[in-house]
C-alpha cells in the first residue's frame, strides 16, 4: 500500500480526528486529518501545476505542521522529496541541494538568511516556498524603546 493510499484511508476513517497538535507560545493548536489533507492536496496540485512532475523537491525546516503537509504533498504526488537536516551549515545544504538535483525548495523562515546563497549557488533551483508565515519578532503590546546619550555643556553624558 502506498503512503498516498494510507493517508486517504486515514482521512476517510478518521477525518475529524486530530492528526497533529503543536504548541504556539502558550496555546495548543491542532489539525484534523481532513484539514491537513486539504493542504496536502493543494501542495500536490500546486507542484504539478508549476511543472515539477518527476522533479526532486528539497525541504529544510524544523518540525512543523507546514513541513509535514509539504512533505506529504510531495511524496503523494509525482515528485520526490529530499528532506535535509535543518541543523547543517549553509555550505553543506547548498552541496546537498545540488547533489540531489533539487529544482524547488520548501524553506523555514529560520533559514531565510540562507536564501540568497541558495539562489546564487544552486543553478537548478527554480522556486522556493516559505514553510510558515513570518512572525513578528516582538509580541503584541511590546514597544521598542531607545535611550540615546549625548553630552551637556560640562561634557557629562545625559540620556535623552
For each feature predicted by the language model, list its residue ranges.
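Conserved AMP-binding/adenylate-forming
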Residues: 29, 44-88
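Short amphipathic alpha-helical/adjacent loop interface patches that line ligand
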Residues: 33, 40, 44
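AMP-dependent adenylate-forming
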Residues: 7-31
